[in-house]
Amino acid sequence: MTIAWLFPGQGSQSVGMGSDVLAASPAARAVFQRVDAALDEPLSKLILDGPEADLTVTANAQPAIVATSCAVLAAIRERVPDLAPPALAAGHSLGEYSALVAAGALELEDAVRLVRARGRAMQEAVAAGVGAISAIMGVEPERLEAFCVEAAQGEVVSPANFNAPGQIVIAGHAGAVARVSELVVAAKGRAIALKVSAPFHCALMAPAARVVERELTRVPIARPAFPIVANVDARPNADPARVKELLVRQVDGVVRWEESVRAMVAAGVTHALEIGPGKVLAGLVKRIAKDLKVLSVGDAAAVEQVAGFVGG
């Protein structure tokens, strides 16, 4: 058995996430206390009580998801004291920060401050209504990229996430995204507009990438205890000098999730823990590598299942 740890990204948030884990785990509660102190505000109250409209704001959702994922991991480690480190870890977009905290490369406090700044910068990079994101299904990647070139007409539109076979997310100017969507539908594919606050992971995020680069100059990065498969190149990295470069490139670069999962399988990974809110990654993994066994751990009941899963 070879295990990977996977950490979810933005969109997995919900009011009350992790509440039963906090109730059962002093270690998880300590994580939330550290996050509140680091941000000098009661983010934990927003996570647990809402309102949902405030939690979904990018500058709140990003630190909230990292906090919850790290709290769940703390509860797992508390419950399974002899838990072995994974062979590899990966996070979907924002989740890469959670993975770096799990590996000891980033301090929790630095991570939540970083993603607070990252979230604000991503929100401010594009005015409301200017950008859009759509999920595309039923079109091959090469053909979709050709559609993006055809539909751009001087605007930005490109693949943002290669999530799973048959599911690619595009991002860019709203008009260009709409034109690509029309081409997709004409080609018998499907295009679903996603409700997000900004067109993440495309060239419009270049100003946000510069902000993240500046913020990272103030943050120490240690050598991760295990390699992290980076979003932008789907390759394992354990070099602290490259962590910052990869995080900067990630802001306006493509999330290569399908390729990342395939890289983990090629490295021998047979089992994975999805650590944090939701079960989005387990669903994607099932479409990428159906033989890879995944346990989604986002509540207290799942924490209790970890020992049996990793021991079996």
What are these regions (language model features)?
Residues M1-L144, L194, H271-Q305:
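FabD-like malonyl-/acyl-CoA
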Residues V255-A263:
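A short, well-structured juxtamembrane/interface segment
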Residues F309-G312:
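Post-His helix in hydrolase/transferase enzymes
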Residues V265-G268:
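Non-catalytic positions within long, well-ordered alpha-helices that form the structural scaffold/packing
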Residues Q10-S12, L39, A103-G253:
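Alpha/beta catalytic cores of group-transfer enzymes, especially the acyltransferase/condensing modules
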Residues A230, E258, G298:
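Short loop/edge segments at beta-strand edges and connector loops
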